[in-house]
From Swiss-Prot:
Specifically methylates the guanine in position 2445 (m2G2445) and the guanine in position 2069 (m7G2069) of 23S rRNA. GO terms for molecular function: 23S rRNA (guanine(2445)-N(2))-methyltransferase activity; RNA binding; rRNA (guanine-N7-)-methyltransferase activity. GO terms for cellular component: cytoplasm. HAMAP family: 23SrRNA_methyltr_KL (MF_01858). It comes from Pseudomonas syringae pv. syringae (strain B728a). The gene is rlmL. It catalyses: guanosine(2445) in 23S rRNA + S-adenosyl-L-methionine = N(2)-methylguanosine(2445) in 23S rRNA + S-adenosyl-L-homocysteine + H(+); guanosine(2069) in 23S rRNA + S-adenosyl-L-methionine = N(2)-methylguanosine(2069) in 23S rRNA + S-adenosyl-L-homocysteine + H(+). This is Ribosomal RNA large subunit methyltransferase K/L. SUPFAM superfamilies: S-adenosyl-L-methionine-dependent methyltransferases.
């Protein structure tokens, strides 16, 4: 065989340039970059060194042959011509990977079979002995890539992908591959920082991938030093003595590296379930003396190295997959920015993000950005110098002011840490951190919120209202509904029309989310966001999350439970507050019937008002359970019935009389538990006729709905005494939206 070989090194997309630099430093010559790969020439020693020391490659492929290919027969004969007896025993095992298409081969499985057949036919002995297939741990892993009519046949020297270092047997929900983590560390300057004695901290460390890769770089440990089986282990071209020499050198370097004073490397993770898996991974990597992991929230992140050294803060914040994650992610980035400004002054920071726009919300400029791919997801690496001249907070500054700051950087006094009598550091007093500056649009939005608060303040205090709407798409470009629930904020984003640029809509949403906590003086962790779109069927009642957290609020002397996270609606329709208060005033001594009861908030008000009995009918067991808790919360139980069923069918079967009836139906509903489909416009007459048949003499029925195009059937006005009371059922907080609902008072004609 030749003394020099053509090598292909594959890597994640975006790492090609870094890998080329690394491979060249390890001895690869004539290096050229390709998409997700590099190629070059090397001797066997360099090929081994690349397998052992490359922190960035996925695979090291040794090219056996290139040949032109027009069809499947060319493929078969091109592979057959290789002297496979120089590479594999006749009773060995193989696995074949095929990539590319064309030249009559559009199915990679078919292409792999042709390659396998050629190898087997070449090595089959007269007595029938032949290689077999082992896709997991073969003696030889063969790769063929078809590229524009040329077949490139290679041996995979790495075996399993080189990112599998062997230490990470436990991982979190969205792990970074080890070689991507190493690339991020290298781009962030960690090799330089580590060589200078700097520290490293990860405030969202998960199971510790950044930490372990950083430790191996700092301790000069070859990333695959613990790998026992390689793609070349059973290859007949393998040179064991040369490999042992390189491996022994790597062991000696690791021993010397670990004998040094350990770098200060710390990780913090909010999820307690990930702490032990992270520690286990660190122990498997042999770095327990170098790396420590603690449970901790981003909000309390404060790295305190033992020698007061500065260093690198590195993290990979979650990307957010569920509807409603926008708010929590925005505030996570804001918290991270605050902690960097407060606790990491003069450090460097590297934030790897799948949402670069959120990176702008940290309140610190990035001086450099790099594009990466995490699988199929495009990402950015934001590099930050945590110095005051990079902070984007407080008042706006002119370009001239910024230039003066750059020319005359602020010197930050390093305060000597005080120790207690036991020699332990005394934690300093917390520092007040400036809020991240709002964008021009965000400030305009904040001003509107504060104006609305001021306008409604006197009314809210006079009425003793705990939950109300403070904003309802007042500004067309900020199409949100914002409700205050005591000291929580519930934000509903109305889906933007398709004509609106999604990036602009997203930017405006982020502007609004940044403004809300400041304008309303609310903890940013108490803001919940949802997207409200046109609902169909039972979709409006479908669970959006499963946190199961209930908040107790008060209204008109009753206590009610709301859930801001799990469903599109919260369990309390704020626009119907005046109707519930009316029912409470009129319910004394009466039999109250609540149809389409939802969480039975109207029934609670009726019971509070002294109703003789209440009956609440709804199709959903979930909401009736919620209703039961609402009633129990106020001490009501025995005389309050909760009935699960289709309202129309229930009315047809029921023969009781009621003095006060409230109907607030959905616009449209279907369910496996009901016969047919309910449409409020179509079915209004039948519904009201059935309900009026249950109304006692002198009784009152209140009918309301939120369908904006609803028209009350004229036959009802001829049949009953009907009064439109909509104007009396809309409070000040919904006065901007007079079409939020329609309401009628219906009685039997005298």
């Amino acid at each position: 065989m030749s003394d020099r070989y053509e090598l292909f090194l594959t890597c994640p997309k975006g790492l090609e340039g870094l890998l080329a630099e690394e491979a060249t430093a390890l001895g690869l010559q004539e290096t050229r970059e390709h998409t997700s790969a590099i190629r070059g020439s090397a001797d066997m020693e360099t090929a081994y060194r690349l397998c052992l020391w490359s922190r960035l490659a996925n695979r090291v492929l040794l090219v056996l042959k290139r040949f032109p290919m027009k069809d499947a027969e060319d493929l078969y004969h091109g592979v057959l011509d290789v002297e496979w007896q120089d590479h594999l025993e006749s009773d060995g095992t193989i696995a074949v990977e095929f990539s590319g298409h064309g030249s009559g081969i559009d199915n990679t499985h078919f292409g792999a079979l042709k390659v396998k057949d050629a190898i087997v036919d070449k090595l089959r002995t007269p007595d029938g002995e032949r290689p077999s297939v082992d896709k997991i741990n073969p003696d030889l892993r063969v790769h063929l890539r078809l590229d524009r009519g040329e077949a490139i046949l290679s041996l995979d020297l790495s075996g399993h992908s080189l990112h599998q270092r062997g230490y990470r047997l436990q991982q979190g929900a969205a792990p970074l591959k080890e070689n991507l983590a190493a690339a991020i560390l290298i781009r962030a300057g960690w090799p330089r920082i580590a060589a200078e004695g700097g520290a490293l901290a990860d405030p969202m460390c998960g199971v510790g991938t950044f930490l372990v890769e950083a430790g191996m770089i700092a301790a000069d440990i070859a990333p695959n030093i613990k790998r026992e089986r390689w793609g070349f282990s059973a290859w007949l071209g393998h040179v064991p003595a040369l490999w042992r020499k390189l491996h022994d050198e790597a062991l000696a370097r690791a021993e010397a590296g670990l004998a040094k004073t350990p770098s200060w490397i710390r990780g913090y993770e909010a999820d307690p379930r990930l702490i032990q898996p992270g520690r286990n991974n660190i122990e498997r990597a042999g770095l327990s003396d170098w790396i420590k992991v603690y449970q901790g929230e981003v909000a309390t992140f404060e790295p305190r190295p033992d020698q007061n050294q500065k260093g690198l803060v590195i993290c990979n914040p979650p990307y957010g997959e569920r509807l409603g994650d926008e708010a929590s992610l925005l505030y996570l980035y804001q918290n991270l920015g605050e902690r960097l400004r407060q606790a990491c002054l003069n450090w460097e920071a590297a934030v790897f993000t799948g949402a670069p726009d959120l990176g702008k919300r940290m309140g610190i400029r990035s001086h450099k950005q790099y594009s990466f791919w995490n699988g199929a997801l495009p990402c950015k690496l934001l590099l930050i110098k945590v110095t005051p001249d990079q902070f984007v907070t407080g008042e706006r500054r002119t370009p001239e002011q910024r230039q003066i700051e750059r020319e005359n950087p602020v010197e930050v006094e390093v305060v000597e840490r005080k120790l207690n009598k036991n020699g332990n550091p005394i934690k300093p007093e917390p520092v007040v951190v400036e809020q991240a500056r709002l964008s021009e649009g965000g400030q305009m939005f904040a001003n509107r919120l504060q104006k609305n608060l001021k306008l409604m303040g006197k009314w809210v205090r006079r009425e003793g209202i705990d939950c109300y709407r403070v904003y309802d798409a007042d500004m067309p470009e900020y199409s949100l509904a914002i409700d205050l629930y005591h000291d929580w904020v519930h934000v509903q984003e109305y889906a933007a029309p398709k004509s609106i640029d999604p990036e602009k809509a997203s930017a405006r949403l982020f502007d609004a989310l940044a403004a809300i906590p400041q304008a309303l003086n609310i903890d940013k962790n108490r803001v919940v966001i949802k997207r409200r779109e046109r609902q169909s069927g039972t979709k409006q009642y479908e669970r959006q999350s499963a946190q199961g957290q209930f908040l107790e609020v008060s209204e008109g002397g009753v206590k009610l439970l709301v859930n801001l996270t799990d469903y599109l609606d919260t369990g309390l329709f704020l626009d119907h507050r005046p109707m519930r208060m009316r029912i409470q005033r009129e319910a004394s001594g009466k039999r109250f019937l609540n149809l389409f009861a939802y969480t039975a908030t109207a029934s609670v008000h009726a019971a509070k008002g002294g109703a003789r009995s209440t009956t609440s009918v709804d199709l959903s067991r979930t909401y009736l359970d919620w209703a039961r808790r609402n009633l129990s919360l106020n001490g009501f139980s025995d005389k309050n019935r909760l009935e699960q069923g289709d309202v129309m069918a229930w009315l047809q079967a029921n023969r009781d009389e009621y003095d006060l009836i409230f109907i607030d139906p959905p616009t449209f509903s279907n369910s496996k538990r009901m016969e047919g489909i309910f449409d409020v416009q179509r079915d209004q007459v039948e519904l009201i006729d059935l309900a009026m048949a249950r109304l006692a003499p002198g009784g009152v029925l209140y009918f309301s709905n939120n369908f904006r195009k609803f028209v009350l059937d004229e036959n009802l006005s001829q049949r009953y005494a009907v009064e439109d009371i909509t104007a009396h059922t809309i409070d000040q907080d919904f006065a901007r939206n007079g079409k939020i609902h329609r309401a009628w008072k219906i009685m039997a004609r005298s």
